[in-house]
Regions:
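Charge-rich, well-structured scaffold segments of protease-associated domains
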Residues: 85-218
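His/Glu-rich zincin catalytic helix
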Residues: 13-85, 193-218
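Short, positively charged and aromatic/hydrophobic N-terminal segments
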Residues: 2, 7-18
């Protein structure tokens, strides 16, 4: 995948009335990481990283690699095992999730404001310090292949994919986000290299929706 940059952001705003004149605070750290903060008085806060590397950045033969990287990023870091990642926020009523689209990859959380430091620490850990254990990668291959099989059972999804393939013919934008089962199995050992090339400070943005300003030290 071509080198693109991560960004920390928030896209899920459920308990806040939106106005046309919302005041965002924006910062750029010395390392190039961009931070966006929307103040809120809500007891629930939202934060996440947006990495500007999605399926449009995949090279020929890499279709599905961005989505694969998203899955295995949750499978362990230098500090945490997979089970710790899954339970870190859930144990205090928080939510941790991710998704991949044509333009980028997003890792985000929703949590009570008193636990925001826990969410930021976990998100930063999985984005910057994932270790991609080969055993977990091998298991996740089958999970993704099952997801692809379910996707292929949906005529509506297949029609939409064909429409995009025609509309963006010759461009990565026309590719299916999941790729094929054959591709997923073929490039599983290349996943670590692809992730390290995509998760750089210059293409990353951090966003938050909370009542306290984010320190530049974050």
């Amino acid at each position: 995948m071509q080198n693109k940059c991560p960004i920390f952001w928030i896209n899920y705003i459920f308990n806040v009335t939106l106005h046309l004149e919302m005041k965002y605070n924006t910062y750029t750290l010395d390392n190039g990481l961009r931070i966006i903060h929307l103040p809120s008085d809500s007891k629930v806060v939202y934060c996440g990283y947006q990495i500007n590397a999605g399926t449009r950045n995949e090279e020929p033969g890499e279709e599905g690699l961005a989505h694969f990287c998203e899955h295995v990023t949750f499978k362990g870091t230098e500090r945490r095992k997979a089970w710790h990642i899954l339970n870190c926020l859930e144990s205090v009523g928080g939510d941790l999730n991710a998704y991949t689209n044509k333009e980028g990859t997003v890792y985000y959380s929703a949590i009570l404001k008193e636990h925001i430091a826990r969410a930021v620490d976990l998100l930063s850990d999985i984005v910057f310090h994932s270790v991609y254990p080969q055993a977990e990668i091998d298991k996740e291959v089958e999970v993704i292949c099952d997801e692809i099989e379910s996707y292929n059972d949906s005529p509506a999804e297949l029609i939409y994919d064909e429409f995009e393939n025609i509309l963006f013919k010759g461009s990565p934008l026309g590719h299916n986000i999941l790729g094929t089962a054959e591709q997923v199995r073929a490039f599983k050992r290349r996943m670590r290299c692809a992730s390290q090339g995509s998760f750089t400070d210059q293409i990353m943005r951090y966003s938050s929706l909370m009542g306290i300003l984010i320190s530049k030290n974050w």
